[in-house]
């Protein structure tokens, strides 16, 4: 994954696809002020239980049913197409595409700190020590 922002004023550039153990993400915008991604979560998979120290993000469900967890808000909630969630720095959260369902596709817009992830639990042994 490149941390180099896209060239200002350039009309078209290839989106960067990053394979993940839970699916993939496509980085379609990367500037010094924001990042835009599309996340594809395979059924039965989930992202790390994590938080960000600086990164501020908002997700929007494009398709599928997304299970979200937040320990700060003490919620386990289901989001469907058209729903959005703003996640602030320090808020512990996790996304999941339920087993037997459809893949979940999310639009994510965030501040540009791509490597600001503190993993607390992870199904793929990527927990930070």
Enumerate the language-model features and the residues they cover.
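A generic beta-sheet turn/junction motif
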Residues: 42, 53, 72, 99-101, ...
């Amino acid at each position: 994954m490149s941390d180099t922002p896209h060239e200002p004023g350039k009309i078209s550039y290839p989106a960067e696809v990053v394979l993940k153990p839970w699916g993939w993400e496509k980085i379609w915008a990367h500037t010094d002020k924001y990042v835009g991604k599309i996340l594809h979560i395979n059924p039965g998979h989930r992202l790390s239980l994590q938080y960000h120290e600086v990164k501020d993000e908002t997700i929007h469900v494009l398709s599928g049913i997304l299970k979200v967890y937040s320990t700060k808000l003490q919620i386990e909630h289901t989001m469907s197409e058209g729903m959005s969630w703003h996640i602030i720095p320090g808020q512990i959260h996790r996304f999941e595409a339920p087993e037997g369902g459809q893949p979940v596709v999310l639009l994510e817009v965030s501040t540009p700190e791509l490597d600001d992830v503190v993993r607390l639990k992870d199904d793929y042994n990527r927990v930070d020590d």
